[in-house]
């Protein structure tokens, strides 16, 4: 009896183990025909050459699914992209400086005139005395009680009727905790994030995985913590902010990474494509762009480009 029981238990354990192995998700090859990244804004906060401030859009199967940042002018690019806001699952904010977030209320206002029914997820770092948290940002923007546009507050308030709700998630930010955190994993899209160093301002880097492809975003950061190569490891695309030249000093160097670091980061992460965005007057001129490119290529030998608004890049 003991032998039979042991055999039965052993068989069940083996069966369960086999089922567990077979049920694990095996990483698939990047289905690049299904995924594309579109530039909604490729400049910083300055009023330069008619390009919008920071914003990116990830498409899956010809549907706009993820927005990263919502800088001034990026909503207009969203409209020009022919995307439908009803399809968007989430807006990921790297941080809450105006050049990354100012168009958010306009997205929500515009969505009022669409057929959107599903909830919208909003994520961003926790706040400090210098910037708001994601929750406070949303409340100050469209909250019923203290928002700039309180007439949009029903989308945040679960007690009020609205066609859909905005679900806000604060991502814990810390210089001392560089743990990669999974913040969303549903409907075929997985999002992970890590805290980054943007001077005293809470900021997040993101990695979005879908259809076997991975696209990572540095946001604004100086690279001092060395956090991004791990998050972006083997990404098909890495979007890096090239806001300053190599000779940057002081505040600029404390807020942004230099081209030489971008090259080292891209090499260490082993990314397939490197996109340089968030260009500013100090990094935009052709001479400066060439200097940045030369410094980056000393370490990174992969595909490097400077995309403009509305450009589409496939993994």
Name every feature range the model reports, one short phrase each.
Residues 15-17:
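N-terminal signal peptide c-region/cleavage motif recognized by signal peptidases
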Residues 205, 212-214, 221-311:
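Cap/insert and terminal regions of metallo-dependent hydrolase folds
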Residues 2, 95-100, 198-199, 256-259, ...:
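Histidine-centered active-site/metal-ligand motif
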Residues 5, 42, 94, 218, ...:
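Ser/Thr-centric signal marking residues that sit
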Residues 20-215, 293-298, 303-314:
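Binuclear metal-dependent hydrolase catalytic cores
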Residues 1-7:
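Bacterial N-terminal signal peptides that target proteins for export
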Residues 196, 220-221:
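Residue-level structural signal for beta-strand termini and adjacent loop
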């Amino acid at each position: 009896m003991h032998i039979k029981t042991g055999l039965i238990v052993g068989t069940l354990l083996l069966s369960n183990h086999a089922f567990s192995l077979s049920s694990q998700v095996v990483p698939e090859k990047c289905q690049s025909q299904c995924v594309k990244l579109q530039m909604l804004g490729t400049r910083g906060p300055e009023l330069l050459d008619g390009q919008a401030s920071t914003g990116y859009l990830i498409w899956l199967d010809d549907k706009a699914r993820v927005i990263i940042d919502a800088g001034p002018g990026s909503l207009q690019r969203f409209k020009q992209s022919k995307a439908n806001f009803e399809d968007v699952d989430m807006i990921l904010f790297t941080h809450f400086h105006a050049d990354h977030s100012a168009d958010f209320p306009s997205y929500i206002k515009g969505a009022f005139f669409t057929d959107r029914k599903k909830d919208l997820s909003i994520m961003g770092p926790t706040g400090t005395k210098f910037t708001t948290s994601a929750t406070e940002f949303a409340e100050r923007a469209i909250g019923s009680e203290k928002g700039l546009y309180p007439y949009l507050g029903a989308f945040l308030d679960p007690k009020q009727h609205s066609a859909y709700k905005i679900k806000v998630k604060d991502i814990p930010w810390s210089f001392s905790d560089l743990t990669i955190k999974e913040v969303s994993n549903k409907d075929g899209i997985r999002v992970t994030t890590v805290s980054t160093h943007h001077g005293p301002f809470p900021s997040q880097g993101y990695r979005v995985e879908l259809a076997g492809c991975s696209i990572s975003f540095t946001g604004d950061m100086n690279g001092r913590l060395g956090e991004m190569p791990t998050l972006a490891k083997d990404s098909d695309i890495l979007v890096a902010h090239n806001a300053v030249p190599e000779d940057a000093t002081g505040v600029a160097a404390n807020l942004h990474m230099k081209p030489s670091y971008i090259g080292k980061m891209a090499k260490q992460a082993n990314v397939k494509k490197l996109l340089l965005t968030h260009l500013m007057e100090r990094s935009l001129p052709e001479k400066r762009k060439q200097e940045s490119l030369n410094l980056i290529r000393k370490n990174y030998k992969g595909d490097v480009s400077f995309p403009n608004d509305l450009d589409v890049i496939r993994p």
